[in-house]
UniProtKB/Swiss-Prot annotation:
PROSITE patterns for this protein: ATP_GRASP (PS50975), SUCCINYL_COA_LIG_3 (PS01217)
Pathway connected to this protein: Carbohydrate metabolism; tricarboxylic acid cycle; succinate from succinyl-CoA (ligase route): step 1/1
Name of the protein: Succinate--CoA ligase [ADP-forming] subunit beta
Function: Succinyl-CoA synthetase functions in the citric acid cycle (TCA), coupling the hydrolysis of succinyl-CoA to the synthesis of either ATP or GTP and thus represents the only step of substrate-level phosphorylation in the TCA. The beta subunit provides nucleotide specificity of the enzyme and binds the substrate succinate, while the binding sites for coenzyme A and phosphate are found in the alpha subunit.
Organism of this sequence: Pseudomonas savastanoi pv. phaseolicola (strain 1448A / Race 6)
Length: 388
C-alpha cells in the first residue's frame, strides 16, 4: 500500500526527522489559510497522488502569495494529474500539500528496500538526488552507496556516519545524517515497509539536512499488523478494476494489451503472459483466480477483464489439481453465458479430468476455442485478437 507524501512526512515527524511545516488541504480556502498558519512569504504547493514526476507535470509549484496557493488548489483539486508514472488517465487529486519553502544548497538521495537475496533491509544513498534512482543505478552504478541492516542489532550510527563521509558530508551534517539514517531504519522496521525513499534529502542553505520528500510503500501482507496505517489508505488512487478484484480475492493488475488473461496460480499466470508475448500478443492484464476457480470467481473475473474495452480476446489457462477440469469447464460456460461474452475465448485445461473438460467445452455450442497445449492456446488467442 502506497502513502501520500503528506502521510509519509507525518510518520517522519513522529520519528523526529526534519520535515517542512505543512498542511494537507482539500479546498482552495484551506490552502490560503495554510499559508497564514505556516507564515513566511514563499510556499510550495504539491498535488498529492501516488505517482512520481509531479513537478514536470505541473503538480508542484512555488507560490509567493496565498492567492496563488488557492488558485493552484482550484486548478488541481478534483482533476487528474498525468505523469510519466501514470497511465493516460492519470491519478485523481483530492489533497494539496501546502508547506514552507526550503532553500536548497545540494540534493542527495536516501532510500531503503527489502533485498530478497540477502533477506535484509538495504539502505541506498547517492550524491545524485532529485532524479530517478533507477536511471542512476543503470547509468552510473558506482554512485549508489549501500548499507545492509543486520536484523539482530538494527541500524547502527556508525553505518550512518560511514555513508555520510562517503557522501562528502562534514561537521554537524554527519551527526544529522546518522540520526536520519537510524530513524528511517526504525520506521521501516516498525511499520513493515517494503520501500522508503527520501528524494531529495537536501542540504539547506544554512547547512542542515532536511527531508524534502517522502515516498513510502507498506508490505500489503503485513497490513493486519498495522491497524493505524489502514486509515491512510486512499481508495481514489486505486485502479477501480483492481479494487473490485480484491473484493473477490482475485489478484488483478491492469496492463496495456488487448488479450485478457485468466489463470489459476501466479507463476502460471506470469508464464502465460510470457508465452502470449512470445507469439506476438500483448496481455491486457495479469489475473490470478487462485486455487478455487469456481463459477462465481470465474464470472467476476470475466466481468473485470471485459470492463477493459481494449480486450479483443480472452485466454483462460487453468491447471486442474484438486479441482476437476470438467467442473472448471462448466464454470467457464456458465460464466460466459451469464456475462454475455461476445469476443473469442480460448481455453487451455490441463490436469485432473482435462479431456472431459475439453469435451464439455466443445459441446457447449459457445464461441469457446479449446486449445490442445499452452503454445496452441497462445497462438490461437493471438490470431483471435487479430480477427483471423
Amino acid at each position: 500500500m502506497n502513502l501520500h507524501e503528506y502521510q509519509g512526512k507525518q510518520l517522519f515527524a513522529e520519528y523526529g526527522l526534519p520535515v517542512s511545516k505543512g498542511y494537507a488541504v482539500d479546498t482552495p480556502e484551506a490552502a490560503a489559510e495554510a499559508c497564514d498558519k505556516i507564515g513566511g512569504t514563499e510556499w510550495v504547493v504539491k498535488a498529492q497522488v501516488h505517482a512520481g514526476g509531479r513537478g514536470k507535470a505541473g503538480g508542484v509549484k512555488l507560490v509567493r502569495s496565498k492567492e496563488d496557493a488557492a488558485a493552484f488548489a482550484q486548478q488541481w483539486l478534483g482533476k487528474r494529474l498525468v505523469t510519466y508514472q501514470t497511465d493516460a488517465n492519470g491519478q485523481p487529486v483530492t489533497k494539496i500539500l501546502v508547506e514552507s519553502c526550503t532553500h536548497i544548497a545540494k540534493e542527495l538521495y536516501l532510500g531503503a528496500v527489502v533485498d530478497r537475496s540477502s533477506r535484509r533491509i538495504v539502505f541506498m544513498a547517492s550524491t545524485e538526488g532529485g532524479v530517478d534512482i533507477e536511471k542512476i543505478a543503470h547509468d552510473t552504478p558506482e554512485k549508489i552507496l549501500k548499507a545492509t541492516i543486520d536484523p539482530l542489532v538494527g541500524a547502527q550510527p556508525f553505518q550512518g556516519r560511514d555513508l555520510a563521509f562517503q557522501l562528502g558530508l562534514e561537521g554537524k551534517q554527519v551527526t544529522q545524517f546518522a540520526k536520519i539514517f537510524t530513524g528511517l531504519a526504525k520506521l521501516f522496521q516498525d511499520h513493515d515497509l517494503a520501500l522508503l525513499e527520501v528524494n531529495p534529502l537536501v542540504i539547506k542553505a544554512d547547512g542542515d539536512l532536511h527531508c524534502l520528500d517522502a515516498k513510502i510503500n507498506i508490505d500489503a501482507n503485513a497490513m493486519y499488523r498495522q491497524p493505524k496505517l489502514k486509515g491512510f489508505h486512499d481508495p481514489s488512487q486505486d485502479d477501480p478494476r483492481e479494487a473490485h478484484a480484491a473484493k473477490f480475492e482475485l489478484n488483478y493488475v491492469a496492463l496495456e494489451g488487448n488479450i485478457g488473461c485468466m489463470v489459476n496460480g501466479a507463476g502460471l499466470a506470469m508464464g502465460t503472459m510470457d508465452i502470449v508475448n512470445l507469439h506476438g500478443g500483448k496481455p491486457a492484464n495479469f489475473l490470478d483466480v487462485g486455487g478455487g476457480a469456481t463459477k462465481e470467481r470465474v464470472t467476476e473475473a470475466f466481468k473485470i477483464i471485459l470492463s477493459d474495452t481494449n480486450v479483443a480476446a480472452v485466454l483462460v489457462n487453468i491447471f486442474g489439481g484438486i479441482v476437476r477440469c470438467d467442473m472448471i469447464a462448466e464454470g467457464i460456460i456458465g460464466a460466459v453465458k451469464e456475462v454475455g461474452v461476445k469476443i473469442p475465448v480460448v481455453v487451455r485445461l490441463e490436469g485432473n479430468n482435462a479431456e472431459l473438460g475439453a469435451k464439455v467445452l466443445a459441446e457447449s455450442g459457445l464461441n469457446i476455442i479449446a486449445a490442445t497445449s499452452l503454445t496452441d492456446a497462445a497462438q490461437q488467442v493471438v490470431k483471435a485478437a487479430e480477427g483471423k
